[in-house]
Structure formats: structure tokens, C-alpha cells
From Swiss-Prot:
Gene that produces this protein: atpH
Membrane-protein topology: Peripheral membrane protein
InterPro entries (UniProt xref): ATP_synth_OSCP/delta_N_sf, ATPase_OSCP/d_CS, ATPase_OSCP/dsu
Domain of life: Bacteria
Protein name: ATP synthase subunit delta
GO cellular component: plasma membrane; proton-transporting ATP synthase complex
PROSITE patterns assigned to the protein according to its UniProt record, in alphabetical order: ATPASE_DELTA (PS00389)
Subunit and partners: F-type ATPases have 2 components, F(1) - the catalytic core - and F(0) - the membrane proton channel. F(1) has five subunits: alpha(3), beta(3), gamma(1), delta(1), epsilon(1). F(0) has three main subunits: a(1), b(2) and c(10-14). The alpha and beta chains form an alternating ring which encloses part of the gamma chain. F(1) is attached to F(0) by a central stalk formed by the gamma and epsilon chains, while a peripheral stalk is formed by the delta and b chains.
HAMAP family recorded: ATP_synth_delta_bact
Length: 201
């Protein structure tokens, strides 16, 4: 099944082949459609850079985050506002068309997940994997690289850390590595990093 995005070259299919093992759901289908277009155009890296820049803008602006997440705004209002942001940020081409199509389809609320899924597809293409890490305070360089090395040893791949700071968590460190279970040896390494973080605090 193709979504209404065909006019911009964006076709969202129900089945995405090997990508199904990496991403899933509606956001995964959108991300895969964009990834396929970017691959064909030789623009995988530039599209990722544009999406990362837009994600940073959303993270920095409460108003923009509300626009993306709130169902109160109409598709027309979201499209007009997000288009202005894209133009101001100099985001055009595939990434710009993609975000506009997402807004027109009333799927802007899922944009952060789509961006994350696109990053996962890019990482898989490069032989990398992405770990979602939640910490109560920013990681020091030493803790960042200790965690990165521990996860790399566990997966046998270069690991990209997607770090989120959430002061409300009490465990010191939460790591999500796709659907893989954290084994005992890695848990021991993570615990040592947790204890080190607590000592610094």
C-alpha cells in the first residue's frame, strides 16, 4: 500500500523487506521510504544531517515541539509553520519534502520516531548499531567512551550512542540496544559505570 506521498516521490509501503528487521510500524515505513529514496539519490548522509538539524531545533524550542506533538493544530497550520522552519534552517530537497509530506498526512507527531528509525537504517547500512541511553546528568567523556566500548564488545559493532538526559531517573543509567537482551557480562560493566557516575555526583 502506498501513502499519499507519491506526488513528492515518497511511497510508504506496507512491507519493506530487510528493513522490517530494523524498524517497524508506521514510523518505520515512512523512514524506510525516505531511506530508499535517499539511497537512490546518493543523499543518505545529507538527508540524515538535515533531519538531525531539524531534531535539534525541535529539542531547543518548546513551541516547535508543541507544534509537532499537539493534535490541536490543523494539517494546514502544521504545514505552514514547519515549512517556515525548514526554509529558515535551509532544509530542502528530500528531507524538506519528506517533512512537509509528513505534516500534510497528519503524521508530524511521529516525526521524532521517524528520524530515529532513519538513523537506525543508516547505522545498519554502515555496520553500526544505535543504543538509546538515558542518564540523569550529562555523561563525562570517560563515561561516554567506557559505555561505548562496553556496548561495542557486546555487539561486535561500532555503537552510536543516542543520549537523553532525564534527571527523574534514579538508576543512574538506562540502556536500550534495539531488542537485544543485556547479558550478565555487560550488566556488570554497566553497573561499574553507574557506580562511577554516582561517585562523581
Amino acid at each position: 500500500m502506498a501513502a499519499q506521498g507519491a506526488r513528492h516521490g515518497l511511497q510508504v509501503r506496507e512491507r519493506c523487506g530487510v528493513a522490517d528487521t530494523i524498524v517497524s510500524g508506521m514510523a518505520g515505513r515512512y523512514a524506510t521510504a525516505l531511506f530508499e529514496l535517499a539511497t537512490e539519490a546518493g543523499a543518505v548522509d545529507s538527508v540524515k544531517a538535515d533531519l538531525d538539524r531539524l531534531s535539534a531545533l525541535i529539542a531547543e524550542s518548546a513551541d516547535l515541539a508543541r507544534l509537532v506533538k499537539s493534535p490541536v493544530f490543523s494539517a494546514e497550520e502544521q504545514l505552514k509553520a514547519i515549512s517556515a522552519v525548514l526554509d529558515q534552517a535551509g532544509i530542502s530537497g528530500l528531507a524538506g519534502n519528506f517533512v512537509r509530506r509528513v505534516a500534510q498526512n497528519r503524521r508530524l507527531f511521529a516525526l521524532p520516531r521517524m528520524v530515529a528509525d532513519y538513523a537506525s537504517l543508516v547505522a545498519a547500512m554502515r555496520g553500526e548499531t544505535t543504543a538509546q541511553v538515558t542518564v540523569p546528568a550529562p555523561l563525562s567523556d570517560a563515561h561516554f567512551f567506557a559505555l561505548k566500548d562496553a556496548l561495542a564488545q557486546q555487539t561486535g559493532k561500532d555503537v552510536i550512542l543516542d543520549v537523553t538526559v532525564d534527571p527523574s531517573i534514579l538508576g543512574g543509567l538506562i540502556v536500550k540496544l534495539g531488542s537485544r537482551m543485556v547479558d550478565a557480562s555487560l550488566k556488570t560493566k554497566l553497573n561499574s559505570i553507574r557506580h562511577a557516575m554516582k561517585e562523581v555526583r
